[in-house]
């Protein structure tokens, strides 16, 4: 159950000077439409995050949604949480996203409280966590900040706790990488995006989103100390991984 939005037409007209992509008011207004039409398997990932939370949430623990945007993962988890004494902490640094996220969260009644926080996820304390979600968020951090954040998450997770990490992937084999990029662009065309929109969005986002390979992610998980980790979902060059402490 994702929030409805206006259609995404941000890149539909020619832009003389394309700036870096930001999660501003314009993007927040069209975000549900944008992400459904841009990220293959997004609805499946959101649904399954709720299922994973149901398995891993412990009573009297914290659940973190870091880079929560409009709260789709938060709402999915909240629908599945039956344990007592739990709290979801949903964090985003975009004021426009946080404002709308609060509206979406408050539209549904639940026994599990949600604290929507406007903050930089790098500055958030992680403690007593049974579930932490980074849903297409880590890729927007500078590479040097990623390891530090994952270390902090690991330290704040309870034993047996889970990190759910959804990302766009790059592939070491050039032929495979290009094929999956092409298939992703086919997916966007099939969802009504024009060549101009695809090209301009790519130009806007390439400097702010720097994806890693699955190997990079697994090596980091191993170095930090996670006991089990793997890919649980992939569609083209997008997917989601779990890492268990």
From Swiss-Prot:
Pfam families: Methyltransf_25. Its EC number is 2.1.3.-. This is Carboxy-S-adenosyl-L-methionine synthase. It comes from the Bacteria. It catalyses: prephenate + S-adenosyl-L-methionine = carboxy-S-adenosyl-L-methionine + 3-phenylpyruvate + H2O. One of its GO terms (biological process) is tRNA wobble uridine modification. S-adenosyl-L-methionine binds at residues 42, 67-69, 92-93, 120-121, 135, 202. Catalyzes the conversion of S-adenosyl-L-methionine (SAM) to carboxy-S-adenosyl-L-methionine (Cx-SAM). HAMAP family: Cx_SAM_synthase. Belongs to the class I-like SAM-binding methyltransferase superfamily. Cx-SAM synthase family.
């Amino acid at each position: 159950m994702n929030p409805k939005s206006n259609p995404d037409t941000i890149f539909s007209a020619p832009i003389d000077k394309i700036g870096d992509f930001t999660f501003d008011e314009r993007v927040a207004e069209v975000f549900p439409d944008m992400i459904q039409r841009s990220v293959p398997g997004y609805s499946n990932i959101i649904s399954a995050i709720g299922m994973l939370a149901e398995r891993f949430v412990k009573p009297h623990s914290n659940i973190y949604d870091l880079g929560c945007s409009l709260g789709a993962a938060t709402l999915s988890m909240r629908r599945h949480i039956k344990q007592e004494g739990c709290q979801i902490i949903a964090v985003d640094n975009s004021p426009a996203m946080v404002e709308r996220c609060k509206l979406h969260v408050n539209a549904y009644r639940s026994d599990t409280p949600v604290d929507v926080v406007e903050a930089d996820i790098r500055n958030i304390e992680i403690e007593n966590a049974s579930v932490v979600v980074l849903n297409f968020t880590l890729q927007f951090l500078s590479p040097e900040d990623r390891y530090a954040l994952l270390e902090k998450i690991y330290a704040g997770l309870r034993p047996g706790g889970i990190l759910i990490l959804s990302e766009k992937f790059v592939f070491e084999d050039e032929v495979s990488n290009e094929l999956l990029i092409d298939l992703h662009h086919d997916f966007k065309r099939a969802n009504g995006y024009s060549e101009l929109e695809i090209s301009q969005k790519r130009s806007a986002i390439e400097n702010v989103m720097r994806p890693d390979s699955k190997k990079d992610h697994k090596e980091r998980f191993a170095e930090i100390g996670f006991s089990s980790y793997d890919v649980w979902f992939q569609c083209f060059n997008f997917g989601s991984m779990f890492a268990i402490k």
